[in-house]
Amino acid sequence: MVRKMTAMLAYHGFSKGTFIGHSYGTSWLSYMCKYAQSAVAALLFLDPICFCLYHPHLTKSFVYHQPDPGSVAFIVRTDMMVSWTIQRAFPWTWIVLFLEQIRVPCTVFIG
């Protein structure tokens, strides 16, 4: 994906871009910070998931906590594809991002 994003920038005549990610989309910003720093001018994280993946209580609560039936959290957590992605196919170690890895202007919004 990083190659595709940098190729997209080059195709449009840009060497750098400002990237915005929301929730799961912040994982792509994490990849850009780690593997294509030269293509990143600035970052905007909206409700990021990539910063606290090393805190076991946060990830454990999403994977194992049973929310109240009928709530939005219940619907999201019990969706077959969301459940499979988080429990079986989520690249935790690739997505986690530490502040030291960000070397460009960055803004984080948490809702």
Where are each of the predicted segments found?
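Gly/Ala-rich beta-loop-alpha elbow adjacent to hydrolase catalytic centers
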Residues: 19-29, 33
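Conserved acidic catalytic loop of the alpha/beta-hydrolase fold
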Residues: 2-17
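Short beta-strand/loop motif that positions the catalytic acidic residue
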Residues: 102, 108-111
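Mobile cap/lid helix-loop segments that gate and shape the active-site cleft of serine hydrolases
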Residues: 62-100, 104
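Short beta-strand immediately N-terminal to the catalytic nucleophile in serine-hydrolase-like folds
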Residues: 16-21, 46
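Short secondary-structure boundary/capping segments
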Residues: 34, 58-63
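Active-site nucleophile loop of the alpha/beta-hydrolase fold
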Residues: 44-56
